[in-house]
Amino acid sequence: MQVRSRGDYEIAGREIVAEGADLRVSVLTLAEGQCVPWHYHSAITDSFVCLEGPMVVETRAPRRLYRLEPGERCAVPPKTAHYVHGEDGGACKFLIVQGVGIYDFVPVG
C-alpha cells in the first residue's frame, strides 16, 4: 500500500511509533525507485537508523553521503538539506527520530 507523506511524496509505508508536540519516531519503507526528496527542517534533527537496506542519506552544505547498512545510523542537523533513498534505487526501511522542535518539511529544488 502506497502512502502520501507530509512532504507530498509517495512512499511504500509509514508507521508512527510515537509522536508528541516536539518529537516524532516513525518507521518508513521505501520501495524500489522511491525516495524522500531533497528538503530540510528549520528546527529539528533527523536521526536515521537503517533497518533494511542498504540505504543512502545525502546532504548538501556540507556535502556528504552516508551509506548505511542495517543497524548503522546517522543524524542530519537542522537547516541541512538532505535526500534519502535505497542504494542504487533499491528498497529500504529505516527508523527515523525527528526532534526536538516543531516539525516542518521545506522542499529544496
Model regions: which residues?
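A short, N-terminal "cap"/entry segment at the start of jelly-roll beta-barrel domains
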Residues: 1-27, 37-38, 74, 107-109
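Short strand-connecting beta-turns/loops that link adjacent beta-strands
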Residues: 21-22, 43, 62, 89-90
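Short, conserved beta-strand element in jelly-roll/cupin
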Residues: 30, 42-57, 97
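Short beta-strand His + acidic residue motifs that chelate non-heme Fe in jelly-roll/DSBH
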Residues: 38, 57-58, 76, 82-89
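A short hydrophobic beta-strand segment most commonly corresponding to one strand
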Residues: 47, 90-105
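Short acidic-glycine-tyrosine-enriched beta hairpin
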Residues: 62-78
